[in-house]
């Protein structure tokens, strides 16, 4: 299987012939990027480090935990207005001009075949050549859902990415920026 979910650790693992891509839903519901590199069967959650970050913002749900900051954690799909001051993947604005989306894990689905992008150029695969992982992140206050789509063609060594943004409310939202991916990699100095 190219896509594996470990419900105990809440880790998604995507395997190709030579690479592994891993993400984890943390205890607060944020989707964190763990690993992308040479193929491994190990759980890479040990790469997450928590240190006192007294001057970094943290989500309200973190309470007084100064070791939890989105500015220091490798988010899979970071958005503006959550205390992460690095490059973002998403910036939306509601009709009142508020630019913020606090995206938390809502659901996921693993299915056979690769997702389709109607009217856009894309990699195509037969039903038995690929698997799709769809992860839904949502902000109930901003009334927006972000559907992260991962297409895994294991034998071809390909992982594709796409994003669908859904307005779940009645008000208008403006998409100021939307990227298919934001790969957060630690620098090695």
Annotated model-derived regions:
Residues 1-189:
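N-terminal accessory beta-strand-rich subdomains and adjacent acidic, glycine-rich linkers
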């Amino acid at each position: 299987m190219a896509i594996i979910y470990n419900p105990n650790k809440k880790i998604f693992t995507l395997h190709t012939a030579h690479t592994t891509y891993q993400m984890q839903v943390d205890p607060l519901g944020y989707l964190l990027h763990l690993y992308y590199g040479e193929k491994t069967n190990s759980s890479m959650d040990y790469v997450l480090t928590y240190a006192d970050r007294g001057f970094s913002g943290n989500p309200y749900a973190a309470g007084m935990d100064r070791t939890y900051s989105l500015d220091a954690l490798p988010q899979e799909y970071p958005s503006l207005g959550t205390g992460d001051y690095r490059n973002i993947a998403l910036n939306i604005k509601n009709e009142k001009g508020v630019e913020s989306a606090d995206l938390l894990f809502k659901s996921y689905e693993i299915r056979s075949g690769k997702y389709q992008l109607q009217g856009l150029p894309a990699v195509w695969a037969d039903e038995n050549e690929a698997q799709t992982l769809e992860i839904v992140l949502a902000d109930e206050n901003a009334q927006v859902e972000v559907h992260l789509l991962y297409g895994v063609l294991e034998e071809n060594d390909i992982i594709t990415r796409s994003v669908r943004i859904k307005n779940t409310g009645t008000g208008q939202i403006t998409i100021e920026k939307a990227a298919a991916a934001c790969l957060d990699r630690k620098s090695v100095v």
